[in-house]
Structure formats: C-alpha cells, structure tokens
C-alpha cells in the first residue's frame, strides 16, 4: 500500500492528551471540538500507519463520535456500533488512546468493539447488521427496569441492506423503547441546497415545539378517527415529498435528516433535540469515508483497511487471487457459470470477473441467506452458480445451505474464503467452525486444498461435480507461484506427501507446511488429506493399521472437525491406534498474526514434533 508520510503528523496533541474521559468533551466549545477532531484525524493516520486497521471508515465518523459523546453519557447511555470497525475514535475517547499502538496485535486491543475491553463498549461486534437488534434489546431492558437512558445504534448504509436490520426496524416500530438509530450514510453526497434545507427541517421537526404540537394535535385527533387518519397521511405525504424517510415512518420509526455528519455543531443541536424524544427514531447523517485525508477520500475502498509495514518479499499469489483467476478462466469456457457474493467482491477476488462478465455477476449486498438460496434457484435451471463467501459469514446462511441446497442436492459450488485463523480481525472473523458445521450435512463434498496448485485442481474437480460442493481456503498466500492447470483431483482421494515409519500425520488444508517440517524431523508419514468429506477411508485404515501413532491437524476447531471424522472412522472399524487431534481449542480465539495464533494453539511444526515425540 501507499505508506503515509507521518513525520509531519508527529505533533503535540494538546487537546487530545487532555481528554481522559468522554465527559471532558462537555467542557469544550464548538471551535475546540473541531480542533480536537483534527487532532484525532492526525492521530489515527499516524497510529494506523504502524498497526494497520480500518482507516477510511474511522476518518468518516470522527465528528459523529465527538457529538454523540458530547450529548450523551456513556456507559449509562449505550452506543452499539454496527460491525464495530468504525469505533476507533470511541476507543480513543474512552480511555484507550495509549493502547492504540497495540490495536489488532496479540494481547492488544481489538479492532472491533468488545464488552470485555471497556464498560463503554455496550455490545460486541464484528459482523454486520446486528446493531439495531442489540440496541433495541438494551432499550427494552431499560424500559422494563424503569431506566430512562438512551440506547443508540450506529449503522452504516451498507449494513442497513442486511435483512436483520429490517427485522429489527419492524419490531422497533411496534415498541415505545427509547431507541435512537444513527444511519451513517457514506455512499451519497449532500448538495448545498438539499443540505441547507435538511438542516432547517431536521432542527425544526426534532425540536420541542414541533414535538409538543404534534403530540397535542394527535391527542385531540384521537377522538376523531377519520380526521386523525387524514392528518397522519397528510403529514407522511408532506415528509415523503421532501425527506427520504417514508420507509422508516411506515415502520413506525420517526425519521429525521439527512444532516451533514461532519458538521459538529448541527450534529450536537440535532442530537440534543432527539435526546428528548422517548420512542424509536432514526437520524440520517451524510458522511464521507476517508474524510479529511485526500488519498483516503479519493480511494476509500483501498484505504478501508490498511496494513502495517511488512518486510516480506513473498510475491506468491493470494488464495483469493487464485480463485478469481480460476473463476474468470472457467467462465470463459462455460457460459453457465455464475458468480455470486454477499458484498465481498473485492475481498473474494471477484472484481475481474465482475468486469469481464457483468451480466453473470451478482453482488447481493450483505445478504448471506439470500445469496445461498439465490444460487439454489439458479441451479434448478441448469446454471452453475459459484458463491464466494467468507467462512465466518457462511454461518449466516446455514439454514439455507441445509434446507435450500443440500436437501435438494443442488449443483452449487461454495468458495469458502478466509477459512481457519484469519489473524488480526480476531474471533468475530475466525473461520474455524465450517468443517464442524458442514461435515454433518448429507449430500455435500468438502475439500481443503493445501496450496494454490491444489486449489486450482480442487476447483476444477468441483466444477465437474453435480451437487453441493465446498472448497475452503485460508487467508493469505500460498507457497507455490505457478497454479494454473487443467488437472483435477480424484474425489475422496488423499495424497501421501512423505513416507516414514511408526508415525503418520493427517494434514488438512494449509496445515500441510508445518506437517512436512515436523514429518522430516520425526521421520513420519505425511498425508495431504485434501477432503474432509468424503474421507479417503481405505487409506486412513491402512495407515492406522501400519503405524504406532496417528496425528491429525486442522485449522478448524478440534471439536467436531476433521480429526473427529477420522476418530469416528477408527472407532467404527475398531482400530485402536492412538490418535492425537490437533486443532483450535474449544475457546474463543484471540487476535494476532496468523503465525502467532498457530503457535499459540499448537498448530506449528514444533508442537507437532512435541506430540509425535511424547
């Protein structure tokens, strides 16, 4: 990535250094708050240049975060940040400024909100579209406990496309909960005319006079049902003509906005007015990703997530790049191939495909359930849909996978990216459950290729199958540069990489590298298993009967994963050769680099040797 020149950013952050608690903001005037926003911007750019993290989204929410903490009182009032990746300013203001140097590092603070990290983090996050549900739950609990504090959800326009958001809005409108939803819309710009009008209208209709008049008028009109109905309809029609809030109003959630999300003064005035409304309401703000940093404003996607400096000279292709290359090559020769992704086209390597075959590419936004069943529908008409999805997000489409794909044995290929330990994103994004929750489903094939070349072969084989098939692959790069091939791997057949004696290591996916290193030291047989379902049962039984010790290793939870499948096979065949199952332990994972986590959880060569030698 383009490194920022941070020497000029190392300044004396006088105002920021004086902020020890969010309540300190209440002593500042608007001019001082604007100066503080500039200091935070400089601090974020300098800090993330060293640690990596989400830059553009956090530059876009500095002013909003300052306004929220100025008007409300956390942790009594609660902020629920959707996804949580845009809450860095919130972390800085709530006592974690000095910990930002450890952001996303092992034993450091999380890149998302985390309840165990601070009392100001009301609800943990990482996945999208959960904030309104959680904030509504908190608001209802406040009502039941006779607590007048405000529960606030901050959600982006992208996250609002998730169906769970609309489920929550539908419920919220049927309650009297003290819920404020802040819709952070960073996909639009405000023209001067609309902006000025919106500011005036929002300040007017969120003020006490308007609220009181509306309340008293409706109180009177309740005695005259027909007139009340007409008045309500007239009000909605008027607001629908000048404000884009009709949808929310129809759901029973009062709409205010849009306002400039970078104008601290108008944000504070509007939030102060909305604080006095004790029912579900939504404030629509307009922001710009990367605000205030030119390169990030011009290319917010590139600077959505920045990486720390790296000394690696590894020019091997990433697994996502290999997948994208295979997708384009195969689609060129097979017009039935369709690409589907739930808002992950860049991360999943589908950008080139979307350009080459726009009519065959479907980014369905944050809608994993829909993506899965959409693919199923296409498959019934003879198409060959490929769903590119992160392992952690496939969890959201699990019912659809079973009910709509597997039970009907539909021909859908799932390219499961970011499988295994993903590193700095931590527990919310760890793809360590897919082998366990997929292998129990009938009618499916599950492959775990060990390299980019093996991955290409696996995808070729998957494309030729007729039924549901999963190809899982990790985040990062393979150790093989050349990967294009017309070869396929035989379904259900493993590959012996190294022959040894007495000890055998069954390696799944990218665990082949540490297994080969350990195998060389132990003089052990090393098998690239390739498949989790179906297993190469004949090979496993033969290996088990001719060795004294067995080891399985996978970057999935050890509970119910690939090792468990081998153990079940041994039990069914009454084979008593001892098996050690190495996998992610049964606990919530931490964040850190992939190599740090492999070492922490015993998924490295040193630990394999230790187990094999014991």
Model-based region annotation:
Residues 12-93, 249, 253, 260-264, ...:
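N-terminal amphipathic, basic-rich helices that act as targeting or association modules
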Residues 54-175, 336-337, 341-342, 350-351, ...:
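Cofactor-binding active-site loop characterized by glycine-rich and histidine/acidic residues
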Residues 78, 287-394, 400-410, 507:
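Non-catalytic terminal/interface segments that mediate subunit docking, oligomerization
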Residues 99-109, 174-186, 406-418:
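A glycine-rich helix N-cap at a beta->alpha junction
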Residues 187-323:
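Long, well-ordered, tryptophan-enriched scaffold segments
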Residues 242, 269-272, 318-333, 349-355, ...:
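Glycine-/acidic-rich phosphate or pyrophosphate-binding loops and their flanking alpha/beta elements
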Residues 309-316, 423-425, 444-445, 563-614:
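Peripheral docking tails and interdomain loops at the edges
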Residues 363, 520, 524-543:
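Generic long, charged, amphipathic alpha-helical segments
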């Amino acid at each position: 990535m383009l490194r920022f020149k941070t020497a000029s950013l190392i300044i004396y952050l006088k105002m920021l250094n004086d902020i020890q608690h969010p309540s300190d903001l209440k002593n500042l005037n608007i001019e001082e708050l604007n100066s503080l926003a500039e200091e935070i911007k400089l601090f974020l750019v300098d800090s993330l240049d060293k640690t990596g993290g989400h830059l553009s989204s956090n530059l876009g929410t500095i002013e909003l975060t300052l306004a929220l903490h100025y008007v409300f009182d956390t942790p009594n009032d609660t902020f629920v940040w959707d996804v949580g990746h845009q809450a860095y300013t919130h972390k800085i203001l709530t006592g974690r400024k000095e910990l930002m140097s450890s952001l996303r590092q092992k034993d450091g603070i999380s890149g998302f909100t985390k309840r165990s990290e601070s009392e100001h983090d009301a609800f943990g996050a990482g996945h999208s579209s959960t904030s309104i549900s959680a904030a509504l739950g908190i608001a209802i609990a406040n009502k039941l406990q006779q607590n007048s504090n405000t529960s606030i959800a901050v959600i982006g326009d992208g996250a609002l496309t998730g169906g769970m958001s609309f489920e929550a809005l539908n419920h919220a409108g049927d309650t009297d909960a003290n819920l404020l939803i802040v819709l952070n819309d960073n996909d639009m710009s405000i023209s001067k005319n609309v902006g000025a009008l919106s500011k005036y209208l929002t300040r007017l209709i969120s003020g006490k006079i308007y609220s009181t008049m509306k309340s008293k008028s409706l109180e009177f009109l309740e005695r005259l049902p027909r007139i009340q109905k007409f008045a309500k309809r007239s009000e909605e029609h008027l607001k629908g003509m000048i404000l884009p809030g009709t949808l929310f109003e129809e759901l029973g959630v009062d709409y205010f906005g849009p306002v400039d999300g970078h104008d601290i003064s108008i944000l504070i005035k509007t939030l102060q007015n909305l604080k006095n409304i004790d029912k579900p309401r939504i404030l629509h703000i307009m922001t710009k990703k990367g605000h205030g940093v030119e390169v990030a404003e011009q290319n917010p996607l590139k600077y959505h997530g920045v990486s720390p400096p790296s000394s690696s000279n590894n020019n091997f292709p990433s697994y996502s790049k290999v997948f994208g290359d295979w997708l384009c090559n195969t689609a060129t020769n097979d017009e039935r191939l369709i690409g589907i992704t739930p808002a992950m086209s860049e991360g999943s390597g589908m950008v080139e495909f979307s350009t080459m075959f726009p009519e065959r590419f479907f980014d369905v936004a944050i809608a994993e359930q829909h993506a899965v069943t959409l693919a199923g529908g296409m498959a019934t008409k003879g198409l060959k849909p490929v769903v590119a999805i992160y392992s952690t997000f496939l969890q959201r489409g699990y019912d659809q996978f079973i009910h709509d794909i597997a039970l009907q044995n539909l021909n859908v290929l799932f390219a499961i990216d970011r499988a295994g330990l993903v590193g700095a994103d931590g527990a919310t994004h760890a793809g360590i459950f897919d082998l366990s929750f997929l292998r129990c489903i009938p009618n499916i094939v599950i492959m775990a290729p060990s390299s980019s070349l093996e991955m290409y072969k696996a995808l070729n084989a998957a494309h030729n199958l007729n039924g549901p098939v999963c190809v899982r692959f990790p985040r990062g790069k393979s150790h093989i540069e050349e990967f294009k091939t017309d070869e396929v791997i035989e379904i259900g057949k493993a590959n012996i990489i190294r022959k040894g004696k007495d000890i055998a290591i069954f390696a799944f996916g990218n665990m082949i590298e540490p297994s080969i290193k350990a195998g060389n030291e132990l003089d052990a047989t090393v098998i690239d298993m390739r498949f989790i379902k179906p297993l190469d049962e004949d090979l496993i039984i033969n290996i088990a009967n001719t060795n004294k010790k067995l080891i399985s290793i996978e970057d999935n939870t050890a509970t119910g994963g690939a090792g468990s499948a081998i153990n079940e096979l041994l039990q069914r065949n009454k084979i008593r050769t001892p098996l050690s199952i190495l996998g992610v332990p049964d606990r919530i994972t931490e964040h850190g680099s992939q190599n740090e986590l492999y070492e922490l959880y015993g998924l490295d060569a040193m630990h394999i040797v230790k187990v094999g030698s014991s």
